[in-house]
C-alpha cells in the first residue's frame, strides 16, 4: 500500500495493490493523516469484500511512530487498533527503498497517467472517489501482458485466500478531549468548532473523521461539523447561538456566527412582516421560528414558512403548527383564538331530548 502526492495536487492518493492479481483500489483525500489512511483501508476492504492477510506498508509517520534500533516498528495508536480489529500482519519496506514494493509504486504512476489526465473535476470528495472506484472496476477487465486471464478473473483466486469482513467496520477517527470556551467554541488541532451555548465551560470529547468533526458531552452528541483543513479558522453553526440571541435581540444582526448564513428569501419576508406588525416582539418570534431548526430540517421549515405567508398567518405559533402538520402528515387546523379579527361560526350541540320528538311523530303515524 502506498500514499502519493504531487506538488500540483490538491489531494492525496492512497493506492492498494493486490500483487498476485494486479487488482487495485485508489482513493483520494484532502490530507495525509492517520484517519485517512485507516478510512482508505476500510473502503478498500468493502470494495473487494474481503481482508488481506498481510500488507506491506511505507514507513509513513501516520502509521509508524518510531523505528527501533532492532528494526521493529512502534505503531501509531490508531493504526495499531486498526490492525488488531482486522487481524492483519503488517510488513514494511526499507526506508527510502521504493523498490521493496515496486508493484504499487508502478501502479501510482499508472493511476496518474490514466485516471488524472486530464485532471477530473468533481463537486465533492464522495463523487470523486465513486468515480475512482468505477475506474478500478473497469481496469479489472484488462488482460495484462504475459497473462491469459483478465485482472478480474485472477482476482477471484486472491479473494479465496483472503479473510471475511468483520461484523462491523473499524471506527476510523482521531479521538481527543477538550473544554468548551465562554464563546461556546471547542478547539481541535488549530481550528475552533462551535457547540450549543448550553454546554459552555463543560468538558467534551472529540472524534475527528476525514470529512467530519463530531463533538459530544458525556453520552450525547452535541455538534457535528464538516472538517476544516485550513488553519486558525472559526467554524460556526448559527443554530448553536440562537438561544442566546433570543435573549439579546439587539445583537442579532451583528452576531458573528450568523454572518454568511444563507436562508431562503421567504425567511427575510417573514421577518419583515413580523417586525412590522409586532415590533421588537416580532423579532423575538422570528428567532423562535429559526430555533425550530434545532429539531426540524430546513426543507420542512421552509415549506411551513411559505405556507404561513400564503395564508397570512404571520406568527411563530402558526409556523410551528404548520410545520408539525407537515411532519405528522395531517391537515392544518389553526387556533383561531390567535386571530380575533377572522369571522367565527358557532355550531350548537343537539340535546338528547330532541330525539324524543321523532319517536312521538313515528308513533302517531303508525296509529
Which residues does each predicted region cover?
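Short conserved beta-strand segments at catalytic cores or DNA/RNA-binding microdomains
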Residues: 12-22, 56, 82, 208
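Single conserved hydrophobic/aromatic residue that forms the stacking wall/gate
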Residues: 1-11
Amino acid at each position: 500500500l502506498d500514499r502519493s502526492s504531487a506538488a500540483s495536487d490538491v489531494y492525496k492518493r492512497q493506492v492498494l495493490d493486490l500483487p498476485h492479481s494486479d487488482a487495485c483500489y485508489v482513493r483520494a483525500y484532502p490530507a495525509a493523516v492517520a484517519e485517512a489512511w485507516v478510512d482508505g483501508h476500510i473502503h478498500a476492504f468493502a470494495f473487494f469484500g474481503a481482508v488481506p492477510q498481510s500488507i506491506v506498508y511505507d514507513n509513513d509517520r501516520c502509521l509508524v511512530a518510531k523505528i527501533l534500533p532492532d528494526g521493529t516498528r512502534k505503531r501509531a495508536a490508531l493504526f495499531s487498533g486498526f490492525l488488531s480489529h482486522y487481524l492483519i500482519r503488517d510488513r514494511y519496506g526499507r526506508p527510502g527503498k521504493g523498490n521493496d514494493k515496486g508493484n504499487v509504486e508502478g501502479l501510482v504512476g499508472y493511476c496518474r497517467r490514466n485516471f488524472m489526465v486530464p485532471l477530473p473535476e468533481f463537486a465533492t470528495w464522495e463523487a470523486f472517489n465513486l468515480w475512482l472506484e468505477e475506474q478500478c472496476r473497469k481496469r479489472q477487465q484488462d488482460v495484462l501482458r504475459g497473462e491469459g486471464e483478465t485482472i478480474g478473473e485472477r482476482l477471484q483466486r486472491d479473494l479465496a485466500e483472503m479473510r471475511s469482513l468483520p461484523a462491523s467496520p473499524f471506527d476510523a477517527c482521531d479521538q481527543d478531549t477538550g473544554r468548551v470556551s465562554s464563546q461556546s467554541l471547542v478547539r481541535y488541532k488549530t481550528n475552533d468548532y462551535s457547540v450549543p451555548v448550553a454546554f459552555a465551560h463543560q468538558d467534551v470529547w472529540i472524534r475527528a473523521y476525514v470529512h467530519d468533526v463530531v463533538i459530544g458531552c458525556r453520552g450525547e452528541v452535541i455538534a457535528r461539523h464538516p472538517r476544516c483543513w485550513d488553519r486558525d479558522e472559526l467554524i460556526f453553526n448559527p443554530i448553536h447561538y440562537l438561544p442566546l440571541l433570543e435573549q439579546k435581540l439587539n445583537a442579532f444582526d451583528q452576531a458573528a456566527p450568523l454572518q454568511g448564513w444563507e436562508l431562503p428569501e421567504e425567511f427575510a419576508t417573514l421577518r419583515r412582516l413580523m417586525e412590522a406588525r409586532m415590533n421588537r416582539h416580532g423579532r423575538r418570534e422570528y428567532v423562535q421560528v429559526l430555533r425550530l431548526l434545532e429539531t426540524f430540517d430546513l426543507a420542512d421549515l421552509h415549506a411551513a414558512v411559505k405556507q404561513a405567508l400564503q395564508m397570512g398567518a404571520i406568527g411563530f405559533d402558526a409556523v410551528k403548527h404548520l410545520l408539525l402538520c407537515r411532519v405528522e402528515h395531517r391537515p392544518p387546523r389553526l387556533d383561531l383564538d390567535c386571530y380575533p379579527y377572522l369571522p367565527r361560526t358557532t355550531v350548537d350541540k343537539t340535546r338528547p331530548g330532541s330525539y324524543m320528538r321523532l319517536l312521538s311523530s313515528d308513533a302517531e303515524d303508525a296509529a
